[in-house]
Swiss-Prot record:
Belongs to the guanylate kinase family. The modification Phosphoserine is found at S149. It comes from Saccharomyces cerevisiae (strain ATCC 204508 / S288c). GO terms for cellular component: cytoplasm; cytosol; nucleus. This is Guanylate kinase. Monomer. It catalyses: GMP + ATP = GDP + ADP. The gene is GUK1. Its EC number is 2.7.4.8.
Amino acid sequence: MSRPIVISGPSGTGKSTLLKKLFAEYPDSFGFSVSSTTRTPRAGEVNGKDYNFVSVDEFKSMIKNNEFIEWAQFSGNYYGSTVASVKQVSKSGKTCILDIDMQGVKSVKAIPELNARFLFIAPPSVEDLKKRLEGRGTETEESINKRLSAAQAELAYAETGAHDKVIVNDDLDKAYKELKDFIFAEK
């Protein structure tokens, strides 16, 4: 089994865009660990593909049943990666990719038998990140402020050396090349 790859970084840094490019170019090499969440789907998101959308009661039941490798609560919503989702990717012969937050990274690091590799996607600046979040048109001012506050904590954590690699996404093509270089350096 190849080592899982954990990708994290503040909301709005381009993680989803980079991963969509990777999956489009290498559809048979990587599998996405589909996270579960209690938040409302955004326009265009598909249940079971982008996230597994569940109720708060369902999520809490999953916590009690130890179904998560990691889970966290952010902006009033729960997010988590299930053991079943990671196993499903591994059984398919693909490298598992987990897109998780800082709390999730800490949880996965506490499970050494996963032998995961950690990649952080950073914005060029907090100001640039704010522009990206505002440009989505899906965030309230309060939500943007919460995300920026969380981003500052995540950026500080990334500076501790908690990740194997940090990529600053100031140019999508350059960031994508760095992503591929990291992923294919050791499978």
